[in-house]
Amino acid sequence: MAVGKNKRLSKGKKGLKKKTDTFAKKDWYNVKAPGTFAIRDVGKTLVNRTTGLKNANDALKGRIFEVSLADLQKDEDHAFRKVKLRVDEVQGKNCLTNFHGLDFTSDKLRSLVRKWQTLIEANVVVKTTDDYLLRLFAIGFTKRRPNQIKKTTYAASSQIRAIRKKMVEIMTRDASSCTLAQLTQKLIPEVIGREIEKSTQGIYPLQNVHVRKVKLLKAPKFDLGALLGLHGESSADDSGQKVEREFKETVLNEV
């Protein structure tokens, strides 16, 4: 009887690497939104722990998070707008972010476009008072005049140009006269959109006027004090203030 190898009996494999949990080398950090929003806690993010020359803070800085404005404002009416937040500073386990951009969801944009009306768009590059260079995109649609019988609401080319000019003027005026934080406060309640709608009534009535997108083109040199001010923190030294007191000479009783 020939004695051969039993293939069913497999020998134990040597030199197998021990499986390591990749999450054991990572840490969770809290993402904090600026004070211009109602809800400050955006969520958490993972990063590799600091080892050797690789610093966790350097890996976190520059990360961009896209968050629904409905979550930041606790209001479902803002669900179609997305805000981009960029990590500029890491303090302890908190990532301090700043406004990086705004956009509409694609389903909202598609729902606005309809037949029998004119779509009017405009964009402009503006610089805020704190030297942030932004590109703002506005969108609006013509609507039926009161007591109009005609089915369509098409605007003439001259009217479109006049409306576009108004859009550019209002966006430039409102954005160039305030800081980035103040502009964010204008964008949340859609102040600019309502202003455009009101000022163009004499040219052609508009509806669904929005600043649909804000793109950050260039940011100024990083200022830690300004960022901490946005997050309601202070970069000042907490050593205390000097208190002036009147000097009183102590009189020793003779023994």
Curated annotation (Swiss-Prot):
The subcellular location is: Cytoplasm
Spell out the molecular function terms from Gene Ontology.
Answer: structural constituent of ribosome
Query: What is an annotated GO biological process for this record, any one?
Result: translation
Which parts of the sequence carry N-acetylalanine? 2
Highest taxon of the lineage:
Eukaryota
Coarse class of the primary localization is: cytoplasm
Q: Which InterPro entries match?
A: Ribosomal_eS1 (IPR001593), Ribosomal_eS1_CS (IPR018281), Ribosomal_eS1_euk (IPR027500)
Q: Name one GO cellular component term.
A: cytosolic small ribosomal subunit
Instruction: Return the Pfam families for the record.
Output: Ribosomal_S3Ae
Q: What keywords were assigned to this record? A: Acetylation, Cytoplasm, Ribonucleoprotein, Ribosomal protein
Q: List the disulfide bonds.
A: none
The question of whether Nucleotide-binding is a record keyword is answered with: no
Q: Does Metal-binding count among this protein's keywords?
A: no
Sorted alphabetically, which SMART domains does this protein's record hold?
Answer: Ribosomal_S3Ae
> Which PANTHER family does the record cross-reference, listed alphabetically?
40S RIBOSOMAL PROTEIN S3A
Question: How does this chain assemble?
Answer: Component of the small ribosomal subunit. Mature ribosomes consist of a small (40S) and a large (60S) subunit. The 40S subunit contains about 33 different proteins and 1 molecule of RNA (18S). The 60S subunit contains about 49 different proteins and 3 molecules of RNA (25S, 5.8S and 5S).
Concerning its family, UniProt says: Belongs to the eukaryotic ribosomal protein eS1 family.
User: What protein is this chain from?
Assistant: Small ribosomal subunit protein eS1
Q: What is the lineage of its organism?
A: Eukaryota, Fungi, Dikarya, Ascomycota, Pezizomycotina
